Amino acid sequence: MKWKIARARTTKITRATTAARHDLEHYCRDLNSWPRSWMGLEKDLPPGEQLLALFRPFLENLATSDLSPKTIQKHVDNMWALGGEFIRDLHSDSSLRKKPVELVLRQMIEYGGPLLYHGREDQQRSFDSTCRKFHGFLTKTARGRSRSPTNSPDQAGF
């Protein structure tokens, strides 16, 4: 029996140069209309617009990431679903309207996402993954905002 010598196959394609990078508009062409698409009543529009302001930096970060276009699109779709579920929760619990949108959102996605209204198990897993990723992004960027030169331990004046 002849033994083949295992050797690594090399490719002449440089993946870094062939991977097309897209901007946010490529993945969500109608991003500015998301709040209207989530809206059930006119009073849903302001929280929807606040959500979009929270979503946009995360979506821009995704669009410029090294993730595959298919994965990025899946995350974008899940973020749109998160907005819809958020507005649905506002309808089912009117006391949430009195709280800041960011606080309600953080509580909603702290351990994954809310249950999807008409979602299959695989969709729920994907949705939860996106929500955890978004929660991590919010936490990381909040830490970055809270650090200012005057809050540095070196300059605290102890």
Annotate the PLM regions.
Residues M1-F158:
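Charge-rich, intrinsically disordered N-terminal extensions
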